[in-house]
Amino acid sequence: VTWVKEPQKEFYPNFEYYRNTAWKTDLNTYVKAEREWFEGFSTFVDLQFRHVGYRMEDPANWYIGGTANGLWAHDDFDFFNPKVGVHYDICRNHSVYASYAMSHREPVRNDYQDNYTQHLKAEKLQDIEVGYRYSSPTFAAGINFYYMFYNNQYVLTGQLNEIGEMIASNDNSGESYRTGIELDASWKPANWFRWDINAAFSKNRNKNWTISWTETNAQGDKVEKGANLGETHTSFSPEAIINNIFTFSYKGASATIRSRYVGEQYLTNTDFKYYVNYNEDGSVDRNVGMMLEDFFTTDINLAYNFKLNAIGLKDATIGVTFYNIFNKKYDNNGWAAPNYGMKNGKLTAYCVDDLYEAGFAPSAPFNWMANLSINF
């Protein structure tokens, strides 16, 4: 950084804010086998072993004055990731399948940076899926049921780090799960028309989410308090997502209408839909929301493809996309970081004279974009 118009604090041009030495070792090996036992019935087995090693050293002076802890890690993770499944073609148009898989995810660099006071754990996922599929020349459809059980799932906390990135943590997520049903269908009754639709309905929960806070007792001493909130909604996990696409085409021209519905989302994992903002005198000022509301949007794309063989090119496509044609006002992201504690005998999410412990990212209103692509 060489220049800042209005620095908020003492500014040092060309200061080296950060230096870090890090090594990551990633080794994996796998065995895969598949067998068809009889016509239409097959099974498969995938076995993977993976080793991940982290070595990070940081002199702890990457902020002026050494006000932040440096990044240091000496971690090794060994993962065994099996997957087994079965597939059966009942007849020409109908098939069913089932699978079980286990996978692991190591913490990434941002996790070390945002959770430097914790000993980070790897995420473990066990996934069971069962599905059915129908397919014909003009129509195809499928249904998939899944249950995903997590240990130490990395979930977004709703908080931001010092550069505005979302913080993910598994310090208190413990056991959690995601379960639901996925549906999709495609219908093409004529060469000039196609209809695609898919939907996902899910339940996403943390089993025993915990929070902690500090209180001052009658003697003026700081006392650590905590609470187990039990089963709570997983943050940023809508329980309904529906997409619908109509496609019209004639010779080189095409038109596509895309609609999407996304259900409401929690900004934290605590199940609080709002926090209470108190004035300095202890009176209630207002409630500040900590939810992303559901929304429905529609986009339209128009395009035309034409050949360019006469000038030595394959073809070109010119198009224009109109986004959010109904000018829907909605937020597609946000953050929330209130305090927690007992207020009038009730566990409360709150702040004192601070309306900015929750924020939202509004999406663009109606807008459009033109494009041109050329294939050589």
Residue map of PLM features:
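Extracellular loop and loop/strand-boundary signature of outer-membrane beta-barrel proteins
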Residues: 12-20, 32, 60-73, 113-119, ...
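Transmembrane beta-strands of outer-membrane beta-barrel pores
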Residues: 3-5, 49-55, 100-106, 136, ...
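Membrane-embedded beta-barrel scaffold of Gram-negative outer-membrane proteins
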Residues: 89, 93-101, 121-179, 184-188, ...
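Signature of Gram-negative outer-membrane beta-barrel scaffolds
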Residues: 1-91, 106, 211
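Short loop/turn motifs that connect adjacent beta-strands in outer-membrane beta-barrel proteins
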Residues: 38-40, 91-93, 138-140, 192-193, ...
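Gram-negative outer-membrane beta-barrel transporters
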Residues: 147-149, 169-274, 373-375
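Residue-level signature of outer-membrane beta-barrel architecture
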Residues: 25, 31-36, 78, 86-90, ...
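Conserved C-terminal beta-signal and adjacent last beta-strands/turns
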Residues: 98, 194, 231-376
